[in-house]
Amino acid sequence: MELQTPKNGVIGTDMPVRDAALKVTGQFKYVGDMTLPHMLHAKVLFSPVAHARIKSIDTSQAEQLEGVRAVVCWKNAPDALFNSCGEEIDGEKTERVFDSTVRYVGDKVAAVAADTAKIAEQALKLIRVEYEELPYYLEPEDALKEGAYPIHKDSNVIEEVVQEAGDVEKGMAEADYIYEDDFETPAIHHGAIETHTSLAVYESSGKLTVYTPSQDVFGHRTNLSRIFGLPMSRVRVVNPGIGGGFGGKIDMVTEPVTALLAMKTGRPVRLVYTRREDIPSSRNRHSMKLHLKTGMKKDGTIVAQEMDVIVNAGAYAGGTMSIVWAMSGKYFKNHKTPN
């Protein structure tokens, strides 16, 4: 297929999508299609419990399996805390590459790099983990109760935002009718056709390159630099193309794992989540609970509105702060509301 180059500038001209022909004919190489010489395949061991301390983890049998080149867990991973969402990179830092505490079913416990994906999967079955289960919460209201067990060391509240305009109390007093109702939105997985995947290369010169369908290559680059203590000049993040993101690939998911394994082995490492791995073990759209109170005149004029929102961050902060700030203001753009 030959693409036609626009002849009369940009405005009012149909612009060709340069990679469209490759994609519709199945020739485009996504990260999951990429291979490099001596490349290893990675698989991740996920937590079967919602919240627990890892009392012990024995990877010795997995390490001895023929074809296994590295096994990583919290014991031999960087201890640096980070926020996986580039928008909040200097915000609340709650994650590690691997942690001695798991905080949701599907949290990362360990990872293996092996000559084949099949060998890596076999190695996962040889890892022995003992968990000390801790309290967990399925509803955000329970996590907010006094005396609730902290999912992280400080508090179960990541951020509280209050925005005001006008005089809500006065507006409600002037209203002819007051309506109150509760609303709830579910957590939704972004469901991109391409699952989370990455391929990391660590050169003997100390340069780290990560290929990933990221929606935030610069945020990923900064995070990887900080996690592994590398100068920014030694870290490169490349997005060769993305098979759908919809916001779900703003956060880092597989990239720190492949980077760590590549640094341990000195060989390229690729990790491709299956669909069954991707949905429980990556990021979802936040679920929310909203209470809305609206004061109105008889002619339908809105004179005051008040909204309380609880945003469910799940196990880690990620981009929650941006969502909280957005929810505290965006709704009131729908209607002219003086208070």
Where does each model-flagged region fall?
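Flexible, low-hydrophobicity surface segments
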Residues: M1-V157, I178-D181, K264
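Glycine-rich loop/linker segments at domain edges
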Residues: T13, D19-T25, E87-E88, E159-S198, ...
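Solvent-exposed alpha-helices and their adjacent loops that cap or buttress functional pockets
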Residues: P16, M34-H38, T94-R96, T101-G106, ...
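General beta-strand structural signal in soluble alpha/beta enzymes
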Residues: G26, A70-K75, Y104, Y179-D181, ...
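Short coil/turn connectors at secondary-structure junctions
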Residues: H38-H41, E66-R69, D99, G106-V109, ...
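Alpha-helical support elements that line or immediately flank enzyme active sites
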Residues: V44-W74, A110-E130, S198-T265, V311, ...
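Glycine-rich and small/hydrophobic secondary-structure elements
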Residues: D90-I119, F246-M296
